[in-house]
Amino acid sequence: MPHPEPRIHCSNPHCTASNSLEAHFCNRCNTPTIKRYLWSNKAIVPNEPGSTISSRYLALSPQIFLDTQPSKAPVTPEEVPPEIVAYLQLFPCYPHVPQVYGLLDNTDAWLLDYGTVPSSPSGQLKYPQQLIPKFQTLWSDAAAFQQLNWLWQMAKLWKPLSSKKVASTLLNPDLIRINGQVLQLLELEFDREYQPSLRNLGSTWKEWSQNAHFTIKDVVEQLGSFLETGKIEDIRQAIAVLDKAIANCRLVSKYSYQIYALTDSGPNRSNNEDAVYPTVDPQNIPQLEKSLAIVCDGVGGHDGGEIASGETINYLESKISQLALEELSPGKILGKLTKYINGANDIISQRNDSEQRQERERMGTTLVMALSCAHEMYLAHVGDSRIYWITPDSCHQVTTDDDLASREVRLGYAIYRDSLQYPSAGALIQAVGMRDSTALHPNLQRYMIESDCIFLLCTDGLSDFDRVEQHWQHQILPVLDGKKDLPSAVNSLIEIANQENGHDNVTVALVHCKVSSQSNIPEEIVSWSDVESALNESNLWADNNLAGSFADSLNIDDSPLEETKIPISTMPDIIGGDENLPARKQPKWLKPLILALIISTIAGVVAIFCLENIDPDPDQNKLPSVRESDTEISE
């Protein structure tokens, strides 16, 4: 009996029509096809090649599967098993560390999600046996800048992976992959007999130095030796050395940036609480060596959101525009950005207090910001507005939302796609201006730019319901190919947000990074003596989301902001149906928690009753006052 031709279903949950694998758009509702390729942490031999498991996962190899029903929630267990807790707690390291997608039906294999993987315009895998190309196969032919950048990304991951006892992953080249300009780990390898040290990392790098680019071979070899012999005891020293080497290598390239941004109130809102910087003439977009883009989504009251988003942008732009970035170290720039975000926060918070705004009347704003200088891109975010990094082969979401769903994941309580089904999953746990800056924890990152790419900054008016994942190839990628200009792309994304979402204001900013070679500047050998001084620099730093700043290592108050709870929007009915979305599940830990509270309450009542009968002295029966530290923060 011939095997039926595999089909892929529409990702729109109100449609789910069956389409051919070659289809770019759904034949019923015209939603762009999403092809989500997944990796299984265990090899599964299908009944026959090209067959599907549980009529859903198309087997392309024993460990590579295509989800043919992307709108359907994956299978997840009632309780989170120990073997995936590290993935969940390393959620802030995405996209370097893959997300757990769910269980492969009727197996004990876990499916891992990388966002996008290299594929052709028709959706065919470019690396059908590897899914994502191996670092080891690309290393020897890579440019000096690329090699240093890959080592730099590994160094940033060392501390968080060590904290979860999975640092062995960085010593196994088979698990290290390169997806666009991002180093991704295929899966995590758990430390077994001993926990790897920097000496082990140094031995590995020293071995790789044999095939390093001739201009940096000395640097990589000596850096490996210093790690191997214990002369470097802090991974931040290695990061500082790599920073200096990269700064030398980038001199052969010229960097320029163009930004176009637009905001729109949307079809169903009379006012616009979003704000954006910069606003420029679409006919005259400047090319800059340094650039700044800011997107804010205001929350709180009819007029409060507009005030908060506008004042935040005005304050940040006025401060950042005065920075001499080329004279500052990465650590100082990150420190300045943190200081300025906290400053903007306190301005809004103090205005809330002076105007006696309470609960839902308090105003605040989400924030995403991209600051570029030469080969460096600094990113900051607070709230659930997002930043995506687009290259010719990839679209990576490089921010994680500050909401309850993400918090459940990084605490190890839930798988992300499962947590999205929880009530109030989109409730913010922080926003600029809602609380004093002592309770604010801005997320900051830094990336190196190897080649042409685009950063998309947007509010949830666009990012909701996977619109970016659906449309980036058709609307943003043509800009990189020279087939579309920035204003056209931004206008298209605004139109998509209004037509396919339409429930909120929408703001979009595109930052186009262009890298060209400077033919008049030859490649020069970077020696160890050129970078060794970085070992003694006192201002060592690390991106705060890749330096162990998880909930178990920082005293972060991430209780939900009552006044910023975002109602779960109803999916637009594109094809005219009136089906309801599946009911959102309660957290799996909620029932045991309620039971424990009931038991403890009963026990407390019994204890009080017994004490009253034992000692009738009324002065001795007064319960102690509750300590301030034991109470929840009231809004």
Task: Enumerate the predicted regions with their spans.
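PP2C/PPM-type serine/threonine phosphatase catalytic domain
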Residues: E5-R7, H14, A23-T33, L60-Q153, ...
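N-terminal sensory and localization modules of signal-transduction and trafficking proteins
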Residues: C15-A17, I34-R36, S40-E48
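ABC ATPase "signature" C-loop motif in nucleotide-binding domains
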Residues: N19-S20, L198
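Long, low-complexity intrinsically disordered regions enriched in Ser/Thr/Pro/Gly
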Residues: H24-F25, N30, L38-W39, G50-S51
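Active-site Asp-x-Gly
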Residues: D191-S203
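Long, charge-rich alpha-helical interaction segments
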Residues: W208-S209
